[in-house]
Amino acid sequence: MSEKLDKHILKNGMVLLGERMEGVGSAAFVLALPAGAALLPEGCGGAGNVITDWVFRGAGAMTSRQVVDALDGLGVQRNSAVDSSNTVFSGALEASNLAAAVTVYADVILRPKLEDGQFTLARELAMQELAALADDPRQKVMLDTREQFYPWPLGRSPMGSE
């Protein structure tokens, strides 16, 4: 099987890469935005985790419930994460639903509602995830090791600190 990547650069500098795979009825996408933990201002550790939840709590003309229902209705298996360099949104779904899913993600990324009341809920969820590290020593060790061996701010935990 020969690998041929299609590449297109948008006017805003975003690079689109694609690979067709004959006989495959699914599609996957990754949107990597330059908004990682190392790029956040001092004192904003963990903000990326709050934001990745907050942006899904209403976007464009949709409420929080409508965003979730739209993605679920399209069959999107999704994830979002923050690393040192990027905030990443990814998904996999039936190929025929890709355009509709990208439209929802465009609203999430470009037109999030960012309502005050939803911020509190997103922040509380991020704090619960941080507290849950006490029950996951493997992840805690990995975060501590990363902080120890990578120079600041690259080693900064995307989860922040208490």
Which positions does each model-derived feature cover?
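Short acidic/polar alpha-helix capping motifs at helix-coil junctions
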Residues: 16, 49, 138-141
